From Swiss-Prot:
GO terms for molecular function: amino acid binding; aspartate carbamoyltransferase activity. L-aspartate binds at residues 99, 184, 239. Pathway: Pyrimidine metabolism; UMP biosynthesis via de novo pathway; (S)-dihydroorotate from bicarbonate: step 2/3. Carbamoyl phosphate binds at residues 71-72, 121, 151, 154, 280-281. One of its GO terms (biological process) is 'de novo' pyrimidine nucleobase biosynthetic process. Its EC number is 2.1.3.2. Heterododecamer (2C3:3R2) of six catalytic PyrB chains organized as two trimers (C3), and six regulatory PyrI chains organized as three dimers (R2). Catalyzes the condensation of carbamoyl phosphate and aspartate to form carbamoyl aspartate and inorganic phosphate, the committed step in the de novo pyrimidine nucleotide biosynthesis pathway. The keyword Transferase applies. Keywords: Pyrimidine biosynthesis, Transferase. It comes from Pseudomonas savastanoi pv. phaseolicola (strain 1448A / Race 6) (Pseudomonas syringae pv. phaseolicola (strain 1448A / Race 6)). This is Aspartate carbamoyltransferase catalytic subunit.
């Protein structure tokens, strides 16, 4: 457990309900299952003629993205809109932060505008924790990705994808392949799989892209792709995060693809009904072959659909938990 994750109780209210969603570390299996079950119930909303439910009517959700994102930002916007919330998306590149305003001041000003929830994506690990503890403790904070640390909603949408396509976790072998070192998605997935009872979690990559001590997540480590993929049920590919790399961690992208790129031939080592996942954006010909990304084993587009439902679940649960905590504190202050 990292110092950041030692603050896990910050995420829960006095009844153990979600009030912030910052990391998956330490969250009980029952709560993760509740998120998955709630998301399952929201999937049918997307199939309606009117894709809305009134759970967050009258509430304001602010998406504050200090890092670029298309998929995550758009699905959070859709999730909030389908819950009937008012949605504000802050373009940080054109905001006051580019004029020297601090993260603290930006969020406090938004809070003064009566925002009820912030979805925050930031390049610094721990940014969402800092905001939840020191800046806006009375506003529900959702971590949309912070540095290398965590991407909890991506982790949960991946778990929903696995559960819907494989039925559960108890008998599965799951391989996470690629740039594990720089991936907040990998960390969130390892934590979620462990909490949900997956017995065989594998990480596969070159030694230079594997974190020191990764075994603490209860995983088996492989540096040979063919060996690591043998008889797995699920393959989660990760992109090379060149923007976070320093030094000569890789000879070239071509060399990485030769050794660790997922091709049709390499996928044959997995089980015949294995599914292939990717959090996006995909680098075709770097970590995955187009024939695999677009093939029968791929559930990559399903992940996007499930992402909306997971984010609806998290937004609605965190808002409910924060409201309950606020009421509890008001009653006990009297």
């Amino acid at each position: 457990m990292t110092p950041l994750d030692a603050k896990r109780p910050l995420q829960l209210n006095h009844q153990g309900q979600l009030r912030h969603f910052l990391s998956l570390d330490g969250l009980p299996r029952e709560l993760l299952t509740e998120i998955l079950d709630t998301a399952d119930s929201f999937l049918e909303v997307g199939a309606r003629a009117v894709k809305k439910v009134p759970l967050l009517r009258g509430k304001t959700v602010c998406n504050v993205f200090f890092e670029n994102s298309t998929r995550t930002r758009t699905t959070f916007e859709l999730a909030a809109q389908r819950l009937s919330a008012d949605v504000i998306t802050l373009n940080v590149s054109t905001s006051s932060t580019s004029k020297g305003e601090t993260l603290f001041d930006t969020l406090r000003n938004l809070e003064a505008m009566a925002a009820d929830m912030f979805v925050v994506r930031h390049a610094d690990s721990g940014a969402a924790h800092f905001i939840a503890e020191h800046v806006c403790p009375d506003v529900a904070i959702i971590n949309g990705g912070d540095g290398r640390h965590a991407h909890p909603t991506q982790g949960m949408l991946d778990m929903l994808t696995i559960r819907r396509h494989k039925g559960g976790f108890e008998n599965l072998s799951v391989a996470i392949v690629g740039d594990i070192l720089h991936s907040r998605v990998a960390r969130s997935n390892m934590l979620a799989l462990q909490a949900l009872g997956c017995p065989d979690i594998r990480v596969i990559g070159p030694k230079t892209l594997l974190p020191v001590g990764v075994e603490q997540y209860g995983v088996k480590v492989y540096t040979d792709l063919n060996e690591g993929l043998k008889d797995v049920d699920v393959v989660i590919m990760l992109r090379l995060q060149r923007e976070r790399m320093t030094g000569g961690l890789l000879p070239s992208e071509g060399e990485f693809y030769r050794l660790f790129g997922l091709t049709t031939a390499r996928l044959a080592a997995a089980k015949p009904d294995a599914i292939v996942m990717h959090p996006g954006p995909i680098n075709r010909g770097v970590e995955i072959e187009s024939a695999v990304a677009d093939g029968a084993h791929s559930v990559i587009l399903n992940q996007v659909t499930y992402g909306i439902a997971i984010r609806m679940a998290v937004l609605s649960m965190a808002m409910s938990g924060q409201n309950a905590q606020r009421q509890f504190e008001q009653e006990n202050a009297q």
